[in-house]
Amino acid sequence: MATPQFPEDFKCPISLEIMTDPVILSSGHTFDRSSIQRWLDSGNRTCPITKQLLPQNPSLIPNHALRSLISNFSFTCSSSQSKSSPQEPDPQTLISNLTCRSSTPSLHSKIYSLDQLNRLCKSNPFFRQRLTESGAVSTVLNFVGSEDSRLQESALLLLLNLSLDDDNKVGLVAEGAIGRVISALRYGKPNCKAYAATMLTSLAMVEVNKGTIGAYPFAIETLVSLLREGKGRERKEAATALYVLCSFPDNKKRAVECGATPILIEMVNSGMERAIEVMGLLAKCREGREEMGKIDECVMVLIQVLKEGSSRSIICALAVLNSLCSHSEEISLEVRRKGVLEICLGLAEDDNDKISRNASNLVQTLRRCLSRA
């Protein structure tokens, strides 16, 4: 059976791709939000089609009718294609397997349905929308609390795919996802813990969720515990989650209070780039700087990064040292004694603009501290 063709009206005039978030410009034409936003962000102030001059701050009005049409068409196509082949399950049947109250599906049936829904959700934003509107999310969240690790893992992966859309990130938090995910983070098998940490990262990509997640009981504490006790992938995902969450000011202090600093220093010493990035955020708060100042090996680990680290790690290490030296003459003198000024003078000539700029900033900080001494 041939793949159904989407009507041309469903395609964005800029990207020529099927629109996932159609919006109407004041000229009356509809575009995909991401495409027209990039057009406007580039400084364009005319309609791409009519060349009509737009207001200083153009409004983008959601085209709910067209979005619904595209969603229905996409879902119908998925269903019809599924029915045409015995290998392809019907999406509506998969959803019904999860939400039907008149029967209790077997464990195998639940896992199968979740895995198939995962496959569909991963590549189809309209199916993700349909699934969230079906009422199945609450059932999937219940599966996250399952004692069966296979069911828990499949449910976490489905939530992760649903969270690809920003609207769903907010909606999942409203549905109570944080508590379920943190429970999996605390008590799940290693693979489930890694997925749970990744899920928190995804939810925290929306600014409004960062404070909510950070303030949730055991959230930051459990991520720090995973840094301390987890293995490779679990530690990496926990560090990434902390990196995203700690861009929110209150979460920096929470991470420090939960004991993240010495663990991060140990991870930096073992070569994990994400750990030095988290340290870069913690060094922006007083509590983080004070904690780093108490740890004897902190400065030496950072100096070692300057000598042997990746470009990204060097950029972060320079920023951390600059923050520490700006607030502590004692650390500034220690850093100078250990030859950092000479290292920075060399790095100031680096071809990487960020390394050069950060090195120059640290040189200026060290010289200011010397003049005050």
Language model feature labels by segment:
Residues P105-N118, D148-N161, A174, K189-S202, ...:
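Alpha-helical solenoid repeats of the armadillo/HEAT superfamily
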Residues L94-T99, T139-L141, R180-I182, T222-V224, ...:
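Buried hydrophobic core positions in alpha-solenoid tandem helical repeats
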Residues D90, G135-T139, N168, G176-R180, ...:
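Structural recognition of alpha-solenoid helical scaffolds
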Residues S138, S146-E147, V170, G179, ...:
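Tandem repeat domain/solenoid detector
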Residues C77, N124, D166, E207, ...:
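Long alpha-helical scaffolds in large eukaryotic adaptor/regulatory proteins
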Residues I14, I18, S35, I49, ...:
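Acidic, Ser/Thr-rich intrinsically disordered and amphipathic helical segments
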